[in-house]
Amino acid sequence: MNKPTIAITSLTCCEGCQVAILDLGERFLRLTGKIKIGDFAFLEEHPESEEFDIVFVEGAPITKKNKERLLNLRRRSKILVALGACACLGGIAEIKDYQDKEERVRYVYKNIDSIENPDIKPLRDYVKVDLEIPGCPINKEEFLDVVKKLIMVISQGLTMEQMPKIARRPVCYDCQLKQNICLLQKGLPCLGPIMLAGCDAPCPTSGYPCDGCRGPLKNVNPDNLNKQLIKQGYSQQEIDMILQRFGVLEEIYPQLPVKA
């Protein structure tokens, strides 16, 4: 059986998700015995392959060059996986979509005639995405599990409907497994009830409220949580700022206009 050729690459981001992959240590090295690394800049400067069975793309397509590269990667791959919050949601960069973008440009760049300043969107808005592994950074164990399952998909000729799925449950589920004290009940602005689990709840476990880096559950109704946070004394502006952090606000309230 031929080894599947895999690329792990990035657009505009901090590349922290790729660091999380390397945190697998020896397990990642063992994984490379089952796959061919066609492109991974953390290991080799230049790609070894032009076509890929699976490409993992971290980061958001912020520039025209990013978008062209994303389209090119899609054409050259059988399966495309969005890797991390920036790729799945827009991520930290999307915060500027909720501000006066032109004003922010003038604040950062004192003397400039023009600059690319588009709205920040997830990969799925530009190309077909076969699977999303969310998080900031990703959960390395989830990545390893997905890669192993994708190898089976390719080697056994399975259909896209038989692709591995990310479990749909709230972060509260992970907290309960860890017997964590509920931060929402302690008065902290935790988004756990409406956000996707799978991260193993490291933030609530450390006493830090979930701020939604894995994105919202599908078809979630955030209004009850919003009312609870208002009752606890948080202003709507404070709540919105938390939801804006990873681009979650636009995901759960897509009808809201972003600022130009």
Language-model regions, residue ranges each:
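Portal/gating segments that form or line small-molecule/metal binding sites
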Residues: 96
